[in-house]
Amino acid sequence: MEKSQGYLELDKSWRHDFLYPLIFQEYIYALAHEQGLNRSILLENTDHDNKYSSLIVKRLITRMQQQNHFLIFDNDSNQNPFWKHNNNLYSQMISEGFVIIVEIPFSPRFVDSLEEKKKILKFNNLRSIHSIFPFLEDQILHLNFVSNILIPYPIHLEIVVQSLRYRVKDASSLHLLRFFLFTLNKSISSFSKRNPRLFLFLYNSHVYEYESTFLFLRNKTSHLRSTSSGAFLERIFFYGKIKHLIEVFANDFQAILWLFKDPFMHYVRYQGKSILASKRTSLRMNKWKYYLINFWQCQFYVWSQPGRVSINQLSNHSLDFLGYLSSVRLNPLAVRSQMLENSFLTDNAIKKFDIIVLLIPLIGSLAKAKFCNVLGHPLSKPARADSSDSDIIERFVRICRNLSHYHSGSSKKKSLYRIKYILRLSCARTLARKHKTAVRSFLKRLGSELLEEFLTEDGQVISLIFPRTSSTSWRLYRGGIWYLDITCINDLANHE
């Protein structure tokens, strides 16, 4: 009931375009704490619960409700180490709570509730990460060239705030955002390290602005010939001065229309990179490349070098992104044909989109988290004295399950079996270290039960694909499985 009441208050505040009062609500910080736990696969931060205790949250809200509540970040108080620690904690809590608030305009829950009143546009880009790969499986086999694009960062933090003004109309919230950006953070690099979640949200909202422009151009190309470029450029998505972009469009407007009318152009974005694939020639891809660079510089004041956009032919290039190595390879196929008394062989080549997991970077991520060494030999993790055996096993099984879910689309399962072996033996070494016994004797006592814990999830998933009656298909299934409920990449998979 309390959670429903909280959503009603959020809905009420958003209907009045006034989100700032939500920063004083305790459930905002509870939501931030819950989402922080869900996003962390390793859960190594043992003081996370203490950091978000109810007493600390109430103390923070009380201080913010004072007349000069931002004096808690005063530089004079930072001379005392105790106050400096508290100020850093308060700053982190406010920034994480602020992310919950500014994400409201992008939430599907509120988009659906406000769609009838036409207050905001409906966003269709809130999709699973795994939805990229089925799309590539269906489309990339028919394409010839691909561009790997490193999306540039804005040169100034104020550009990010300006991009957010259309989505968040509450001036007080924008002033609070500027306070975080310019008072507590001196540069984009320091801001991304101190407030990673807020930085990712602002970066994604900034990138979405020029992506929405591309979507508009793609959908409206059939109507642009009867619309003057000046009137077109006055649309609400553009915020800054438009004289530079008008010059770009005025040079060769018909050529730009021809460029956007490519029906075989596909665009995919992931993290700080994007992929632009087309069936056309390399000349068309080069025109896209320089148009993107000019568009970033003239409209969004973002400087980008031509080297950040590389063009490759799909037949001899592999896509390394999101923990997978994807490539288009030719499978030779010999077909014997019989015509009357004559028989002959026909050689065919079939294109296949192959997706595999990179084992070496994944082992490097496990080694960084101290589950194994750089050679892949399992290591024991230090266990807390008050942790039970079931808690330790559950933690390792959760990590193994998340990795198996994320990399379940691989066409070769041998790499996943190696990762499961490392985690299973690391779990056994951790338990043996806790009980001060040998690993061999501990595995003899708990080996079968521990193995069942790590393999139960795979059996449940495959049983949804094949019924238990078809035991042969159930045992021999080696195809990829894509989960359409994965909305964030886990820490171990993010080895780019």
From Swiss-Prot:
| Keywords per UniProt | Chloroplast, mRNA processing, Plastid, RNA-binding, tRNA processing
InterPro entries from the UniProt entry: Domain_X (IPR024937), Maturase_MatK (IPR002866), Maturase_MatK_N (IPR024942)
Q: Which GO terms describe its cellular component?
A: chloroplast
Which GO molecular function annotations are given, in alphabetical order?
Answer: RNA binding
GO biological process, alphabetically ordered = mRNA processing; RNA splicing; tRNA processing
Q: What superkingdom heads the lineage?
A: Eukaryota
Q: Does the keyword Plastid apply?
A: yes
Subcellular location field: Plastid, Chloroplast
Record flagged with keyword Hydrolase: no
Q: What does this protein do?
A: Usually encoded in the trnK tRNA gene intron. Probably assists in splicing its own and other chloroplast group II introns.
| Family membership | Belongs to the intron maturase 2 family. MatK subfamily.
Protein's name in the database: Maturase K
